[in-house]
């Protein structure tokens, strides 16, 4: 059996993501493993996303850095609250926040931390939403060199399979 000493759980703080956080905590507790809980902050936009005639002023470098720092601090507080309120007491857990592409940061951290398992949620987007936004879970599964457990929220499981 694969030894599990360190589990990486990631969250975007959505309702659909909570089951993955809980699963990561349960697995870490079951195996006596450390849980590394990660949230990735999207970087502030630095290029216009609208036509020039509708352009708004984008933040300068120092404003961008301040925005990202504020988001990191807010996210770290939210992660710590999640650990206290939702995860088993006595669990060995570290919380981390990174800025960047969610999939890339999850994979990068899984390597640098030498985790034994990545636990991630899927939001179940289909159609144009999947095409427009992509799937962080899908990108992680394709690019990670570590095992990945993808957790669906209960609302995503087809009704005929809930028996």
Specify the residue positions occupied by each region the protein language model found.
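Short, well-ordered secondary-structure micro-motifs
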Residues: 20, 47-50, 107-108, 131-132, ...
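General small-molecule cofactor/ligand-binding pocket signal
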Residues: 36-38, 94-98, 149
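Short, hinge-like loop/turn segments at secondary-structure boundaries
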Residues: 52-56, 112-113, 136-137
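Glycine-rich, Arg-bearing micro-motifs that act as flexible, cationic patches
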Residues: 117-139, 157-160
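A short acidic, glycine-rich active-site loop
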Residues: 57-75
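Structural beta-alpha unit
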Residues: 1-2, 30, 42-44, 73, ...
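Small/aliphatic-rich secondary-structure junction motif
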Residues: 2-61, 154-156
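Short, flexible loop segments at boundaries between secondary-structure elements
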Residues: 146-154
């Amino acid at each position: 059996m694969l030894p599990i000493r360190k589990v990486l759980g990631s969250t975007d703080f959505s309702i659909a993501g909570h089951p993955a956080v809980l699963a990561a905590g349960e697995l870490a507790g079951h195996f006596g493993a450390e849980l590394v809980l990660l949230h990735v902050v999207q970087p502030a936009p630095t290029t216009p996303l609208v036509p020039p005639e509708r352009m708004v002023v984008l933040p300068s470098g120092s404003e961008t850095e301040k925005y990202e720092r504020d988001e990191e601090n807010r996210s770290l507080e939210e992660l710590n609250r999640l650990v206290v309120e939702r995860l088993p007491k006595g669990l060995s857990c570290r919380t981390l926040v990174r800025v960047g592409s969610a999939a890339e940061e999850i994979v990068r951290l899984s390597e640098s931390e030498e985790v034994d398992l990545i636990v991630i949620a899927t939001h179940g987007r289909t159609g144009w939403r999947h095409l427009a936004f992509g799937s962080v879970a899908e990108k992680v599964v394709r690019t990670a060199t570590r095992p990945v457990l993808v957790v669906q929220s209960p609302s995503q499981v087809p009704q005929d399979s809930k028996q």
